[in-house]
C-alpha cells in the first residue's frame, strides 16, 4: 500500500505540471506514454518492440498520433502508413516462415490503432481546453472510486466474471452515479456550452465506456495470462493499466462534446 501511494504521489507530481503546460511538452509526453503502452501490449503477445514488426508498429504509431492541426496532409499520410504497414507485416509472415503469423500481424495493427488513437486524443483534448481534459480525468477517477466503494459495500452480482471476477453490477452502477458529481460541480466554474441534462447524458455515456475500456484491457490480460500490462508503475502495473479507460473516453468526449 505504501509503494502504491508513493508511486501515485510521484506520478502526479510529474504528470500535473505537464498537463497544465500543455502544448508541445504534453504532446511529447503523450508520445512517450503511447510508445510504452504499445510495448506493453506487444509484450503480452510475445512481440518485442525492438523487432521488425515492433519497429514498424512504433513508426506507424508515431504517424497515427500526428496532430490533425498540422494540415490535410496528415490524414493522407496516416492512411498510407496503415496500408504500407499492412503490406509489410503480411509480407513478414512469409519471410519469417509463419513464425510471425497472420494473427500477429492483425494484433500489431489493432495495437497501433487502439493505443495511437487514445493517446492522440489525450493531447488533442488538452489543446481544446484544460477543462475538457480535467473533466475526462475526473469522470474516470470518480467512476473508478464509485465502482470500488459500491462494489465493496453492496457488490453481490458479478458484472463479467470471465473477464474481471471482482467487478460487480452494483459497482458498475455506483461508478455511474459518482461520475455525475463531476458535471454538477464543474458547471459552477466552467461553461461547456451545453445544458445540464445533455452534459449529464454525455457523462453517463463516458462513464459506461470508461468501464468498458477497463474491461477490454482486463480481457487482453486474461487472454494472454498476465496480471498487469507492465511494471513501470510499482503497485499500479503498467501505463495501460492506468490509461485503459481513457482509450475509450477521450475519443468519445471529442465526438460528443467538443466536435458537436
UniProtKB/Swiss-Prot annotation:
Q: In which pathway does it act?
A: Phospholipid metabolism; CDP-diacylglycerol biosynthesis; CDP-diacylglycerol from sn-glycerol 3-phosphate: step 3/3
Presence of keyword Glycoprotein:
no
Q: Keyword set for this entry?
A: Cell membrane, Lipid biosynthesis, Lipid metabolism, Membrane, Nucleotidyltransferase, Phospholipid biosynthesis, Phospholipid metabolism, Transferase, Transmembrane, Transmembrane helix
E.C. code? 2.7.7.41
Give the bilayer topology: Multi-pass membrane protein
- Which protein are we looking at? Phosphatidate cytidylyltransferase
Localization (cell): Cell membrane
Q: Which domain of life is it from?
A: Bacteria
Amino acid at each position: 500500500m505504501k509503494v502504491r501511494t508513493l508511486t501515485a504521489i510521484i506520478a502526479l507530481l510529474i504528470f500535473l505540471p505537464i498537463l497544465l503546460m500543455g502544448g508541445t511538452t504534453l504532446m511529447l509526453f503523450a508520445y512517450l506514454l503511447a510508445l510504452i503502452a504499445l510495448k506493453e501490449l506487444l509484450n503480452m503477445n510475445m512481440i518485442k518492440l525492438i523487432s521488425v514488426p515492433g519497429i514498424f508498429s512504433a513508426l506507424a504509431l508515431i504517424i497515427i498520433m500526428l496532430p490533425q492541426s498540422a494540415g490535410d496532409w496528415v490524414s493522407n499520410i496516416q492512411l498510407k502508413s496503415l496500408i504500407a504497414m499492412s503490406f509489410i507485416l503480411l509480407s513478414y509472415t512469409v519471410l519469417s516462415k509463419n513464425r510471425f503469423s497472420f494473427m500477429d500481424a492483425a494484433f500489431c495493427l489493432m495495437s497501433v490503432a487502439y493505443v495511437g488513437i487514445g493517446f492522440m486524443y489525450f493531447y488533442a483534448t488538452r489543446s481544446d481546453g484544460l477543462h475538457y481534459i480535467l473533466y475526462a480525468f475526473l469522470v474516470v477517477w470518480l467512476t473508478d472510486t464509485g465502482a470500488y466503494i459500491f462494489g465493496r459495500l453492496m457488490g453481490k452480482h458479478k458484472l463479467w466474471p470471465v473477464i474481471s471476477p471482482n467487478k460487480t453490477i452494483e459497482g458498475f452502477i455506483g461508478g455511474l452515479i459518482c461520475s455525475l458529481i463531476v458535471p454538477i460541480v464543474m458547471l459552477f466554474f466552467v461553461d461547456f456550452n451545453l445544458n445540464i441534462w445533455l452534459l449529464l447524458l454525455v457523462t453517463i455515456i463516458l462513464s459506461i465506456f470508461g468501464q468498458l475500456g477497463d474491461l477490454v484491457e482486463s480481457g487482453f490480460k486474461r487472454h494472454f495470462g498476465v496480471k498487469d500490462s507492465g511494471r513501470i508503475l510499482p503497485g499500479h502495473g503498467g501505463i495501460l493499466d492506468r490509461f485503459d479507460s481513457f482509450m475509450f473516453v477521450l475519443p468519445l468526449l471529442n465526438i460528443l462534446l467538443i466536435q458537436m
